Amino acid sequence: MPDTPHAADFARQAHKAGKTVMVHMPMDPATGPFAWRPDMPASELLGRLQAALRAVPYAAGLNNHEGSRMTSQPEAMALLMNELQQHGMFFVDSRTSAATVAAAKAQSIGLASLSRDVFLDDTRTVEAIAGQLEKAIALAHKQGTVVIIGHPYPQTLEVLERELPRLKAKGVEWIPVRQMIGERGNRATAAHGK
């Protein structure tokens, strides 16, 4: 997230380690100096996006943090996708709302994009997170791929540290986001995991 104290340092470290850096962009109802809100003019939205990109060096892509109100705004999402395309970036729709038009706007201009299938940690218990990971594994077997979103909560990290080494035995390969975009051919999976 661009407004966190160590965003730039973490982005540099991730880039140095060969990881894909993404901006986790705050969107309404999220607040803060970078957050996009429906009442803002395009110039303000673009200014906040540019500031966020400066705050997170090496960003190759962007996804929405919260954004249930913002991602349902067609004009703002078209503006965002056009700007990301000009920067050669990709977009991952966190799908915080069933009314989102973000992925559709990305796809309409051919912007590399994905949509989330499973949230790992809406409920922050080890048991619930492990259950969501099992749901994701089942979905991956059913539809071929699955996009998972989680947070660096201690419970999430505990589950991932325990379970990631076991994925291959379960017939699942953990792949980078750019590879997933290639696997899905820039098309959203039917019903986005529902």
What are these regions (language model features)?
Residues 1-194:
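Catalytic-site microenvironment of enzymes
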